[in-house]
Amino acid sequence: MLHFIQKVSGASSKMLKNPFTVRLGAGRIDILSLKTCLLQNFSSLPPRTWLSPSFQVCMRKIQCYHVSPCNFKKQKAVLPPKKRSTITYLLDSPKPALYITLAGLIPFTAPPLLMVITKSYIPVLAFTQMAYGAGFLAFLGGIRWGFVLPESSPAKPDYINLASSMSPILFSWAAILFSERLNEAIVTLIIGLGIALHNELFLLPHYPNWFKALRIVSTLVAFISFVVTLILENIYPEKGPKRPD
């Protein structure tokens, strides 16, 4: 450290002997001679002899760190794959189940279609549509009962599963009781179909996705067919008996 002070004092004395060059025309001080003098004096020092030992140790530790430029670009978040909608599994259905389900929708759609063609409201066709809807709704309850019977089934034969399978049957029974008042019977079936679909999709989600897709399609077709029948009663004139002989 003493050697460093001596060198600095020697440099200061040399700086006094070599004064700054003043450029009067430019109005500024030329410090080139000062830089040259300092470089000559400090270059003659042995490397790092003028540093204290503690400072040298600190410098060695600092040199161990690697500093790289930070990447401030926003990286795109990796989003999870979008879940498929239940209705998209319709084409994954087994062909026999798909074709039989589509054929089973004909009794729902045929009566209002014939009424539109003949431009008349036919109570017999509306009654047959209602009777088929009652049987269809009871069949949905039986599906749930049969689904819980196998030992390997994910749905267990507990009170929730077995009791939920009875609700479609009760709505079917009520619709048959109201068959004298056809409109009330059709509304009862619409409510029963909606409750059954809600239970199967949200409360009892054990069915395969393709079966859920079939249930959505069949319920929508039945609902639209029943609503069209109720509308046609108020549009077209009534024709034929109210019930089959």
Curated annotation (Swiss-Prot):
Cellular component GO terms, alphabetical: membrane
Membrane topology: Multi-pass membrane protein
Bilayer-crossing regions: 97-117, 122-142, 159-179, 185-205, 216-236
Superkingdom assignment: Eukaryota
Name of the protein: Transmembrane protein 69
Organism encoding this protein: Mus musculus
Entry-linked Pfam families: DUF3429
Predominant location category: membrane
Cellular compartments annotated: Membrane
Keywords: Membrane, Transmembrane, Transmembrane helix
Signal peptide (from-to): none
